Swiss-Prot record:
Gene3D superfamilies: 3.30.70.260
Name of this chain's protein: UPF0237 protein MA_3235
HAMAP family, per database record: UPF0237 (MF_01054)
Record-level GO cellular component terms: cytosol
Amino acid sequence: MTSSRFIITVIGSDRVGIVARITTVMASYNVNIVDISQTIMQGIFTMIMLAEAPKENFDLAAFQHAMDAEGKSLGVEVKVQHEDVFRFMHRI
């Protein structure tokens, strides 16, 4: 399968349902989690995922909008960056 990889970060106050609701949006866009790290630091929820989506017929803008909207409804910040952009921004 030809695919695109993304880094997805989620940060905000911890509450019930963050993982469930974020991953539900991901599944609706056929986005697969390749790797995940999640922790709660003094009540602050943090999660970073390496995710993969099919290149064919995948609407990145719509996915980003859906993730942002779900994040806002949860009171957390969700960022979706293509892996290449993330690597370029975080290189030393």
